[in-house]
């Protein structure tokens, strides 16, 4: 059994770690609320844009934009949103597992995959396991802007425009609540038709002013950008929620460990006292 002094040192070490995890839990809770505010502010725009695009995809258009046309799939692209920092439980690895399974399904069909990474954890993971990473951006902080994301988005859209990609997906964590974040893979291009049954039963005709090509070029790019930005802010809220939960679990586990160490310390102390008393009694008997 370890000595009382050694056990006291372990207890002090766990207590110091517990203070750190508690502080990180509180910081994550504060950042999560701010991230939720940003997510709530951007969500109406992203959802409205998705509805508008759903109308377009179901419509009888006088100009059929390339982003609306299905192609034979030979190569797919993924915009992968991960975190820049760790200590957020299984948030990243669960996302990567889902992505790897989807990539394998395409690979089994003879389809090649390209990756554009947002977040350093995704970059380091696919550098280690292997993956065709064609673009990346890291270190965006807690308040990302669209201008920081535009690099990977532009690379993937250019590849799609040039016919080097036939499908484009965004991979990110969807924030449900503090305890639940779901890894999702959402198709961006070609634009998926709306799932609304009312829209499916109707035929839509549009008139464009001044020019359908110029309008759709701008509108559809804005759509992709809005979905990527929404994915990033939701992933950020998911990160802070997962970190808060992970740090709370670490703090609670630290408390349990301290109780166990305290019990071991008491037993060690009791054994030490018993040994001292035995030695005293033995010495007195010898006299």
Curated annotation (Swiss-Prot):
CDD domains: F1-ATPase_gamma. InterPro entries: ATP_synth_F1_ATPase_gsu (IPR035968), ATP_synth_F1_gsu (IPR000131), ATP_synth_F1_gsu_CS (IPR023632). One of its GO terms (molecular function) is proton-transporting ATP synthase activity, rotational mechanism. It is a peripheral membrane protein. It is found in: Cell inner membrane. Produces ATP from ADP in the presence of a proton gradient across the membrane. The gamma chain is believed to be important in regulating ATPase activity and the flow of protons through the CF(0) complex. This is ATP synthase gamma chain.
């Amino acid at each position: 059994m370890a000595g009382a002094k050694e056990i006291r040192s372990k207890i002090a070490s766990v207590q110091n770690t517990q203070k750190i995890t508690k502080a990180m839990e509180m910081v994550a809770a504060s950042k999560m609320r701010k991230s939720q505010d940003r997510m709530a502010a951007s969500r109406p725009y992203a959802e409205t844009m998705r509805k508008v695009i759903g109308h377009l995809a179901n419509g009888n258009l006088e100009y059929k934009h390339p982003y609306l046309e299905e192609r034979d799939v030979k190569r797919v692209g993924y915009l992968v949103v991960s975190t820049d920092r760790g200590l957020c439980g299984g948030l990243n690895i669960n996302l990567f597992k889902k992505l790897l399974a989807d990539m394998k399904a395409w690979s089994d069909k003879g389809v090649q995959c390209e990756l554009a990474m947002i977040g350093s954890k995704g970059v380091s993971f696919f550098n280690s396991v292997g993956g065709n990473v064609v673009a990346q951006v890291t270190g965006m902080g807690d308040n990302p802007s669209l201008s920081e994301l535009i690099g990977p988005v532009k690379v993937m859209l250019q590849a799609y425009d040039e016919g080097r990609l036939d499908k484009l997906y965004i991979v990110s964590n969807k924030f449900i609540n503090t305890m639940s974040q779901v890894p999702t893979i959402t198709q961006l291009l070609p634009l998926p038709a709306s799932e609304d049954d009312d829209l499916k039963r109707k035929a839509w005709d549009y008139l464009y002013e001044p020019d359908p090509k110029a309008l759709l070029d701008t509108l559809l790019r804005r759509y992709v950008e809005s979905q990527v930005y929404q994915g990033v802010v939701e992933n950020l809220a998911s990160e802070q929620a997962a970190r808060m939960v992970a740090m709370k679990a670490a703090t609670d586990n630290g408390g349990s460990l301290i109780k166990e160490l305290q019990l071991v310390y008491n037993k060690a102390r009791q054994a030490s006292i018993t040994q001292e008393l035995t030695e005293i009694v033995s010495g007195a008997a010898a006299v």
